[in-house]
């Protein structure tokens, strides 16, 4: 009986944690390419080669890789994510920016006006972006149902208490709500390393 009770208590505890928290994902450096830049790097008629799907519906990892080049250094083997974008965009960490010699502003994906550029290289082909380099602002993707459950709305900033090996609370986490999203919190590898993140970790949403 005690064993059954313990199992029931553990199952209930897991349900409660799941209801009160969101799963966290660490997002590494990556590139989104426009049609023009995809062809400039990989040849006329080039298509993105899907390798695996990401947690957000319609987003996927591609086989294509590029090298980022800045005034101080370069970063090879940077993954391209699909699908194609209207404008090319590069997301890196602040630490990556030091390696490149470029300071990326902290922005949400898609907010690339007035941002610095970077050179993308594949073999002997290169594209110089005059803008589009950012460090992604920490954020939470949410379905409308989950946003209602947590009592938040699109554009609101919350705190994220990471329940990790080195717990910490992240401020200024922007909520992004859409029926096209799956509910996940996204941090970069600087933040993930700081809190001892490992795959499957969760976080509390705090006001």
Please provide the spans of the model-predicted regions:
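Short beta-strand-centered segments at strand-helix junctions
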Residues: 30-71, 76-123, 128-161, 172-202, ...
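Short coil-to-beta-strand transition motifs
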Residues: 167-169
